[in-house]
Amino acid sequence: MTRSPALLLLLLGALPSAEAARGPPRMADKVVPRQVARLGRTVRLQCPVEGDPPPLTMWTKDGRTIHSGWSRFRVLPQGLKVKEVEAEDAGVYVCKATNGFGSLSVNYTLIIMDDISPGKESPGPGGSSGGQEDPASQQWARPRFTQPSKMRRRVIARPVGSSVRLKCVASGHPRPDIMWMKDDQTLTHLEASEHRKKKWTLSLKNLKPEDSGKYTCRVSNKAGAINATYKVDVIQRTRSKPVLTGTHPVNTTVDFGGTTSFQCKVRSDVKPVIQWLKRVEYGSEGRHNSTIDVGGQKFVVLPTGDVWSRPDGSYLNKLLISRARQDDAGMYICLGANTMGYSFRSAFLTVLPDPKPPGPPMASSSSSTSLPWPVVIGIPAGAVFILGTVLLWLCQTKKKPCAPASTLPVPGHRPPGTSRERSGDKDLPSLAVGICEEHGSAMAPQHILASGSTAGPKLYPKLYTDVHTHTHTHTCTHTLSCGGQGSSTPACPLSVLNTANLQALCPEVGIWGPRQQVGRIENNGGRVS
């Protein structure tokens, strides 16, 4: 808490300094008021002014505000840029910076000079500029054009009432002179004063048909001379509709997915409106929001790029078609229009078929490969595992071994549900039927009932007990081959006493072997021997 008063005092002390920072614009750097620029070069004038709030700047030349209409002048945040300076650009330039607290002005004096040779010195402030030059001490240089890129366009077409500027910026030593001629005739002083505004540029304004011709600039000094010729064509304005010149647009063929273009060249007294249309094929009218009728046919209006003016007075426009499809094929129209009417010309575009059209198998394969790889691997593996488990279970079921010995009755132990009473003998026929059905006989119950008198009464309880014990497994627990070794005769249950009983149970088997007694049952607690 003891630091709070000190912190408050510190903040209060900073407030006056922060308020003091806000104020009128001030100079951030030194400037050189006198600036010298070479003729035809680019010059930059800085305005290093700062302030809080940031000031707004405005440039003036000889008291006239410089604005966007000055084509060679550009006002930048850091200063003023003048391109291709001319002799008339010399003067006093002022940068005025203003904010809510005041204003500040930065003054420049711009001097434009021709190129001078290295051997010639500019006279100093105290030097003398008079006297004759010593030719022996001078290095002469013949004239040369310093801006050849500005002179590439030698054929110029302009309509009546427009203007044009012809440039021949040159340098040399001694300083060259320039003379303008029209159709090899020197322009008189009166004609030159009407047109020429600047030393190296001939400006022709408010052109008339008689201004058409060849204009030549001749630049010379003691070391030599050079010249350049411009052809000016002044087009007489006529009240007529535009005319499509040349052969374009022409029929075109393009590959599927390729790029092509149509071009349209229109001659008009004034800048025309050039528009591209595409004929709507029959049955596809619903694909387009709006259509227009031209000559009784429906067309859709296509996006159109810039219209370029050509030196011969015509106008050019191109329609670009990229990644061509079958829908792009058809008839296209170039329409040129002005206030007096319109003209149009048509051409056809043919799109070759796709050499590799996509097919349904490719789509299905791509969709299948889009499944996660665990699913692709897991489904077949699971199917194989389930199939193997089922096959293994079937094999184990067919090859299941006989019941273990623990299932046999123990001596002195009577299985539950068994009884020695004759009331239990009533189930014997049904059990015998089950035994004989395993051996293929359906008539065994009748034989058992018929031979019931020969078998002792004590046989049924014991036989019933033994059969009941072993039928729940549906397999034979103790078997003996009735047909001897190597016989294919089915095995016989040991619970029968002799062949008579066997034949009574299963008469259809037919072969029982040479032995008369294949087993016996002793009444010793249910043990089988």
UniProtKB/Swiss-Prot annotation:
Main location per the UniProt record: membrane
Entry GO MF terms: fibroblast growth factor binding; fibroblast growth factor receptor activity; heparin binding; identical protein binding; non-tyrosine kinase fibroblast growth factor receptor activity
Keyword Metal-binding applies: no
Extracellular side: 21-374
GO BP term, example: ventricular septum morphogenesis
Role: Has a negative effect on cell proliferation.
Protein name listed in UniProt: Fibroblast growth factor receptor-like 1
Gene for this chain: Fgfrl1
